[in-house]
Amino acid sequence: MAPKNGTVQEKKFFSKELNEEMTLLVYLPSNYSPLYKYHVIIAQDGHDYFRLGRIGRQVEELLSKREIDRSIIIGVPYKDVKERRNTYHPEGSKFSAYKRFIAHELVPFADDEYPTYQIGYGRTLIGDSLGATVSLMTALDYPNMFGNIIMQSPYVDKHVLEAVKQSDDIKHLSIYHQIGTKETDVHTTDGNILDFTEPNRELKQLLEKKLSDYDFEPFDGDHKWTYWQPLITPALKKML
């Protein structure tokens, strides 16, 4: 029997950190009940994870098989490619404000609106490319607020590597790290062509030393949703 479909709620609220109205996409599973507590999956690139990643469908199927704990998804869409870079890139003009938005505004919103666990292990950050970057960097800034990070082909630069090196209070984090073996010539949104594989290997070496629960999953593919979509399920099964 095919799993039932949950519901997607569109929630709007004004972010003081970003000084703009934010739209959130909240996925509640088909058997959602306020009588139970739920893990919260916070997805950067919210529209992409729902449409291209089909994350709602994958969570629903895992729940129907009882392969993950009860979970809701909060997707944070981006307005356009330029705005995405400004908020997700370590050198972006809104990067710091966006991290504060996640920690100081989105998390309290989720805890107020839904029956969540309200502790770090009950929150998972997930993102692809730059979305994975800002997920990791947010968790490094707020290590007690988040317990799990799923990184799909993260963009890694000197800022990311240095942040990991300087982070001493992250041993408790659980990280699932995916990168394609063919991501050697990735066309970025600012017009450059970058090798993602070598920086991710450097990141792997650092995280292996820092964490007790770290999974590195190379896959035979490149920087596309074609490869990321089927890799969401195994990551969720491990983290939830």
From Swiss-Prot:
SUPFAM superfamilies, per the entry: alpha/beta-Hydrolases
InterPro entries: AB_hydrolase_fold, Esterase-like, Mycobacterial_A85_antigen
Signal peptide: none
Protein name as annotated: Uncharacterized protein YjcH
Biological classification of the source: Bacteria, Bacillati, Bacillota, Bacilli, Bacillales
